[in-house]
Structures are given as structure tokens and as C-alpha cells.
Amino acid sequence: MEVKAFLCQHKAENYENCEDRFCVNIDTKSVAVADGMSQSFLPEYWADLICRRFSESTDGWYPTHERVQELEPSWNKLRDKYADLEEKKNNPYSYLIRNSIAEKKSAACTFVGIRFLSSKKLKYHILGDSSMIIFREGKLKSEEDIFSTHRGKFDSFPDFFDSNHLRGGKGDPVNDEIQISDKDTILLVTDPFSDFFYEKAKSGNDCSEYLQEVKRLNSHDDYVKLVEKWRNEGMHDDDSTLVVIIPNDKDTISIAYEDKDPSEDIFIDKTSQIKSKFEEEQPKGKSSHQRENDNTDREIIDCSEFQNFIDEAINKHGTEEHGWFGWLKILFNSFVKLKKFKGSERKRIKKMIRKYLNNKQ
């Protein structure tokens, strides 16, 4: 099997701040991808731990909500080490990290991992909207060849593994075996690709042309250009991971290309991310009283469709596990994606969501 693995960050971020992770291990014939959920706390560390534990396992270990509890102490150590380093650097926003630790905020990630049992068979393990996509003889023959615990439901509320055993995560992982052939191509992807290919397959597109574009990738620059192209075609803007696996008649795995793992710089300066969240929660130049009484903005809810969208999401999924800022981000991203707002309209929608959530508290 030949493997190529690529990462690309959200358009507004730096590569080092990407919260997706992948691992390819040629000895255990294992490949894993995890999507750190950005509304959680330091999710990239959690995604990295689960990917590494799975791919390096020689005893067939795979994640379940119970088994990932063994990784919780490791995540706690990484979290505390990061907090210590930020304080030593006199980061003015380091208190936000300590506050998050005191509030027992945790990390969450989706996961897809495969382990080759032979050149003709693999075992897969999936939780959330990260997916395994199988092209049979160069074609995506139906939505059924996109394997995810959501099976076509790619929204902003995926199943996940949680770093806090008291929360326990969400959803039931899928674990199964499947036959493959040397005429197949396997993709392990995070949700932007899951959603993109699902919509194409649902409309009857066999995606053969898209697969050819994928097979031509040989560098990070090639991949970034492809992601930008597909975003212009409707793929949503988020951290995007793509691992391409081409089976053959060999029982070994060779890595033809892989992007640098951001985990190599696991204690990079995240000041910009922390500051960004702080500024979104506390807009400059206005006190909370002024924001509540600001009549220069449009009405809090100016269409019943928007109000129904938020109410339905809250009634269906609850809010406790996400927290205030998490819900701001989830709802904003979901509604913007739904309505394809841009520019100043995006800022207005974010204000509307903030005000509406404040009124519901």
C-alpha cells in the first residue's frame, strides 16, 4: 500500500495552529486521522494522543470511550506544561488557560483509523464526521461508500471522544472489517471532505475527476492549491486533512509523501488563538452594559428562520458540554455555512448570535 498524507489549516489560521492530526505507521500497518474540535480546549493534543496510541499499537488497540481514559493523564500533563510555558513567557492571556483548567474544560476530537490485516482486508474504527471513503475502480459509487458514524449527517454536532472521563464523549464508535482490492483507492478525511464528497455522491457524481486530482498530489503546495480550489466549489473552510491510500498486492505500507506534523511543535505560541477568543468574548471599546443596550445594531433576531435554527439546535443538542463560547462558534459556523454569508454580514450574524444567547441565559 502506498500512502500520501496532507494537512491544511483553516484559511484564517497558520499551519502550526491546525487542530487536525494524522499518523501513519508502516510497522503496524495502521493509519489514523483525528479532528480536534475547536470549540473544546487544546483539542490538538488530544487528537495527537489518540492517533499515536492507535497507530503505534502492536496489540490491536483501538479507541472506545472507556479505553481513551488511559490517555487522560497524558493530556493533563501536556495541558499543564503548556500553561506553565505560557506563564513563563509572560503571555498576558495565560490566565485564560488557567481559568479553563480550573473550570475543568476538556478536549474533544473525532476519529477514523484503519489497520490492514492483509493486502485484501482492513479493519476500521470511526467516531464522528471524520470518514473513510472508498473509491471502487476509480469511482465513488454511492454515499454508502463514505463510512462515518453520521452516515451522511455532516453538521456541527459530531460524535467525539472526550479527554474528561466524567463527560464520557458522545456517540457509539463503529468497528468493522471490509474487503478491498488493488483497484480501490481509500481516503481518510476530516469533515470538510466528508461533506463535500457526500453532497457530490448524493447528486449522482461519481467523483472520478476529483479522485484524479487527489492522485496527482505530490507536495504540500499542491494540496493547498487543491483545497483552495475545492473551497471555491463549495467545500467548507476548516482544518482539512486528507490521507490517500492506494492498495496493491503487497502486504507492506510505504509512505510516498506526508506533510510535517504540527505536533512536532506541540508547544508553539498560541497567543493569537487565545487573544482572538478573548476579543470575541469581550469586544473592544464597549462594556457589557453598552453592548446590551447598543441600538446601532440590527434587531437581535430579524428573521424567524434564524431564531428557529438556534432553538432547534439547542433543544436537540443541549449546551452544557460546549459552554458559551463554544456555542457562539458552533452556531456561527453552522449558520454562515447554511446561508453562505460573507464579509460584514458574517460579523452581523456573529453579533446576533451573541446577543441571542445572552438573552436565553
Regions found by a protein language model. Give the residues of each.
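Catalytic core of PPM/PP2C metal-dependent serine/threonine phosphatase domains
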Residues: 64-135, 169-180, 234
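N-terminal entry segment of metal-dependent catalytic domains or homologous docking segments
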Residues: 1-59, 130, 166, 175-177, ...
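C-terminal catalytic subdomain
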Residues: 163-316, 324-361
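Short hydrophobic beta-strand that contains or immediately precedes a catalytic carboxylate
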Residues: 31-35, 125-127, 187-189
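Acidic loop->beta-strand submotif enriched in PP2C/PPM serine/threonine phosphatases
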Residues: 15-25, 103-119, 123, 147-198
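Short glycine- and acidic-rich boundary segments immediately preceding or forming the N-terminal edge
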Residues: 1-18, 86-99, 145-150
